[in-house]
Amino acid sequence: EARLTNPENKKLLEEGHALVCLNPEIGHILMGTEDVPYCLARVMREGRLAHTHWNSQPLGNYDQDLNVGVISPEITEAALFVLKMYGYTGYFGIDINPERQPVDVALKICMDALRAAADRINSLDYEKVVWAMMHPDKARGWLEAYLIRMRALHPEKLPPLWELPMD
């Protein structure tokens, strides 16, 4: 982009726009055996995320375009966590090929899956999550135990989570 000479392109760059951006599809990231949150973080770090393209995909190189969150919902949550940490406010596109269900039903399911995952992510105690990530020697296992409780339908049935030594 630094070598562009067209005045319109230069103006867009001066306004803070990127002319080359990515639209990563979750399923294609997985087909490439890449880590979804890490891929999104790399794109965000460079300021090149146009918008996201969501679906579910089993591991393997066969593009199935399943409904969001049907397979490995923790990947959806982790990806949303990364986007939230980067302050992403862009669009969430849905790329599915519903089998044996009407398209409008599949779209509603996908939107519900994204909303439910975002609700779980938004309800996290970010101060504790970041502290645990920054102090792994003092928080061994805490983050995993915390996330299990955040996903549990009845977390009160699990043993209480120990306190972090955040002093």
What are the functions of these language-model segments?
Residues 1-167:
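Histidine-acidic metal/acid-base catalytic patches
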